[in-house]
């Protein structure tokens, strides 16, 4: 039976950093809870509490929640409203689809002065004649009942008709309580009958007859007979058919909607779930182990993980090199390597990889390395029987390279002794040459060079005359 534990509350308090002492809202719906416990001690600051769709049969252990404003107990097995007097700040109470038949128990809510909303839809008491008038007259602080606002005229009318409504309500309540007592007795007798049937079925099983047989003289144990696989398969099919018939009978059997029937259905489903889990675990356990070596001693090649691999025969170094493509992000602690003289076995997450080697190797001289970039496992295994081989003469690669790529000569200038007279000195005056003007355009105009004219013999330079610009 699931219970309210500290671990459950902390998991449901992720929005509050998993702190439960300062928790103001928590949802514990659909947890198959049958009791309310520990919440009033661990979560004193609670304001909103969701407990809908469980198997709670009694309101308890909430009286210390002084700040609780909203309590949702819909879809449970509650039959009586009680133990809510200590919830001083309670404003909304939801008891939709429960088994509240004792309507007089709402008198305990008169002390909850801040109660404004109450939901009793889907309860047996909601079918009583005069149910709404009785609740409105009994709880004057209510503003909403079953999602409908209580008007002032409705309250006045309910207070006027309260004596007659109270009498009719008591009669209907007593009739319902007698009916509930009969249902409880019927459920109890039904449960006892099922227990007796289960005991009988256990006693009918082979190997048990309530007696013990001892023979002092007979000390030789009986030989163990191996079960016949055909008989075993037949027993399994018969057992499955019996379970299917039992399940069909359970769901086809008519039953009343009572707290006991809800509990019975829940426990039946829980047993079925546990049996399926146990059967699945049994099937997993029954899985035969992988055969790596036959009874004759022959080693098999196995690659259960379906990993890519390559085995290279390095003749120059006289060794085998195995490259196994292990997953890159797999932790090395999950890899186990075992090198034997004739084969190698690698366990990757408990899944074997086994490979038979072409020749014997030295296990003590072998080494295993793993790449940090690709994650591949490289196992180097020297051969046990060494073969003396002459090393191949290295081809003159250097000479060919020198022929193809001759060495570059150094960039040093060699100077010769030359007669200085034979050396022509450059004319520094003619370094910049005048650009010749070329014809431009279709008319080919030419710019004539201006030549300096010589002065005539009778030219007199008069200083008073300004120069021509």
Curated annotation (Swiss-Prot):
Key words of the record: Cell projection, Cilium, Coiled coil, Cytoplasm, Flagellum, Leucine-rich repeat, Repeat
A single BP term in Gene Ontology: outer dynein arm assembly
UniProt keyword Phosphoprotein present: no
Main location per the UniProt record: cytoplasm
Chain intervals for the UniProt region annotation (Disordered): 179-290, 436-469
Coiled-coil region(s): none
Gene Ontology CC annotations of this record: cytoplasm; cytosol; dynein axonemal particle; extracellular region; motile cilium
SUPFAM superfamilies associated with the record: L domain-like
Repeat (LRR) residue spans along the chain: 20-43, 44-65, 66-89, 90-110
Disulfide bridges in this chain: none
Statement: the UniProt record of this protein carries the keyword Repeat: yes
Ranges of compositional bias, category Basic and acidic residues: 179-213, 261-286
Localization in the cell: Cytoplasm; Cell projection, Cilium; Dynein axonemal particle; Cell projection, Cilium, Flagellum
Domain LRRCT, chain residue ranges per copy: 114-135
Family: Belongs to the tilB family.
Function: Involved in dynein arm assembly, is important for expression and transporting outer dynein arm (ODA) proteins from the cytoplasm to the cilia.
Name of the protein in its database record: Dynein axonemal assembly factor 11
Species of the source: Xenopus laevis (African clawed frog)
Gene name tied to this protein: dnaaf11
